Amino acid sequence: MAIERTLSIIKPDGVEKGIIGKIIGRFEEKGLKPVAIRLTQLSKAEAEGFYAVHKARPFFADLVKFMTSGPVVLMVLEGENAVARNREIMGATDPKKADAGTIRKDFATDIEKNTVHGSDSVENAKIEVSYFFPEVQVHAYEWKKLA
């Protein structure tokens, strides 16, 4: 199995609800370790650039407005098959369609305020990680097992 890195974002609704630790804990419990993490407020330009692939979609303006409405947590998660594993942990984009026990089913309000973002492919993960984190800000480390 391949060790991968993926971008995860705890969106403004997740930060506002005070569930940052719970979300990170879910990733760690499933073998994804944060190797870079930052709390920040996205500018309009950053959000528009990051979501540029959706620029022609009718929801683009609302997405940018939401993603700039409050702080977000940007993370690089590392682990075996990190992209697919992250998407499983998050659940379906629409919380109503998400499986029980996923982040979106448990914490999200609706398809817009769906609490988390995760890269959708290995290729996009590389692009998304580099958008927010220069390589020097990503730190590999080994987990030590507790006795």
Curated annotation (Swiss-Prot):
NCBIfam families: PRK00668.1 (NF001908). The keyword Kinase applies. Signal peptide: none annotated. It is found in: Cytoplasm. Keywords: ATP-binding, Cytoplasm, Kinase, Magnesium, Metal-binding, Nucleotide metabolism, Nucleotide-binding, Phosphoprotein, Transferase. This is Nucleoside diphosphate kinase. The active site is at 117 (pros-phosphohistidine intermediate). It comes from Anaeromyxobacter dehalogenans (strain 2CP-C). GO terms for molecular function: ATP binding; metal ion binding; nucleoside diphosphate kinase activity. Pfam families: NDK. ATP binds at residues 11, 59, 87, 93, 104, 114. Major role in the synthesis of nucleoside triphosphates other than ATP. The ATP gamma phosphate is transferred to the NDP beta phosphate via a ping-pong mechanism, using a phosphorylated active-site intermediate. Homotetramer. It catalyses: a 2'-deoxyribonucleoside 5'-diphosphate + ATP = a 2'-deoxyribonucleoside 5'-triphosphate + ADP; a ribonucleoside 5'-diphosphate + ATP = a ribonucleoside 5'-triphosphate + ADP. Its cofactor is Mg(2+). GO terms for biological process: CTP biosynthetic process; GTP biosynthetic process; UTP biosynthetic process. GO terms for cellular component: cytoplasm. Its EC number is 2.7.4.6. Belongs to the NDK family. SUPFAM superfamilies: Nucleoside diphosphate kinase, NDK (SSF54919).
